[in-house]
Amino acid sequence: SIYGHVLNGLNTGKANIAKALLFHSCQNPLSDKAISKDDAQYIGFGLPNPNLREVLFCDRSAVTLIFDTEIQVGTYLSIDNFPYPKPLFKNGKWHGEIMMTLLYNPPLDANFGQEYCRTNVDVSLGVYKYNAKGEIEFKGQVPLDVKWEEKYERERVENGFKWCPIKSYYRKIKQGIEGVSWRLYIDCTTRSNAFIQRQPFTLIITIKDPSGKEDIYSEVISQLRERGFTFNDLQVQERIRNLYGIA
């Protein structure tokens, strides 16, 4: 299976990373466009990419960041001044193609019927920008911020991926967006009477230069080093690297 090849290709042997990579690679079998909300009802997140090289590696015009960690329930994780590629800032606006996949295994309890998933993890990648009053505020871009009212909980579940243990988002910024800097925000909530302390999760973010010209990978790696982030390359089996001629 494709999943087996991905899992066996990783030195870590972490099933959740392999699963997340598989979903992250999914493509629309109906066209080369992103999967719409309506299509998703019939084809889910699409078909996994059978090309192992494209699943495990990326070109210089793109960078993929994998966060495999855990979050304390009732709190949030935030990376301010997120290292968004500077070459994608042109004429005062941010551009780029963004794919984001979030996967976690929530505690399940059949005693609660349709509410059997007991935790929900949300993620937002967005920008800090000035509002009309000249105040700085955060605006989610992937996914786009939506002001859900409590009475529309069903709508949020159906269209906002709430309580879904796999969330997949895509956006191609064509017109550009204004913003001072980027921020990654993750939070975790539970249903009532769910006594859970921590929720492990895997988050994958890919940022591409749509033109394929800019060296996005090296630029983001440089930002990570400058800001003191601790990170490692994805550990791929040596035989896989040799197979595709990747050092």
Regions found by a protein language model. Name each.
Residues 1-32:
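Hydrolase catalytic cores
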Residues 23, 35-39, 117:
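Flexible domain-boundary/linker segments
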Residues 107, 162-165, 208:
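Intrinsically disordered low-complexity regions specifically enriched for long asparagine
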